[in-house]
Amino acid sequence: MMDDAADQHWMRHALALAQRARDEDDEIPVGAVLVSADGQVLGEGGNRNLSEHDPSAHAEIVAMRAAGRALANHRLVGTTLYVTLEPCAMCAMAMIHARIGRLVYAASDPKTGAAGSVFDLLSDSRHNHRIEVLGGVLGDEAGHMLRNYFRARRGKRTVVP
């Protein structure tokens, strides 16, 4: 398990990826970085589903695909995935299949969150793998970025934290 400083460091990295996805591609600002047990970046990315016309190109999937290519392995054992928004069911199940060790997320997703908000797929005893979960790391910052993105898309003024 990493310490609070490491979790915040990597979450800030994920927030920067989310901001880049928003600024460069007008994507929903979600960023993810997959880190090895010894602190090496294995894969990272922001949401790409709008720009690539791919409903599966969520930030988590982008990061896991990059890590799988880098390691030449579909198993990502012992890794930690940092993501700015609680994963959906698709991403959560991909994490289980990849054998991710730990998930750290920023903002909860009360509509589609699958790490405890709506569903709790990651600790379901029916699966052959469980993932340690820590939520709320820099959650206010991530939530603010997401709310302002959607406010701007709806033609409303953004809100300063």
Describe these PLM feature segments.
Residues N73-L85:
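Immediate flanking context of iron-sulfur cluster ligation sites
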Residues M1-A21, M90-P161:
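Zinc-dependent deaminase
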Residues D23-D26:
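Short loop/turn motifs at secondary-structure junctions and domain boundaries
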Residues V30-G39:
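Short beta-strand scaffold segments in enzyme catalytic cores
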Residues S51-V62, A66:
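A short, polar/charged loop-to-alpha-helix boundary motif
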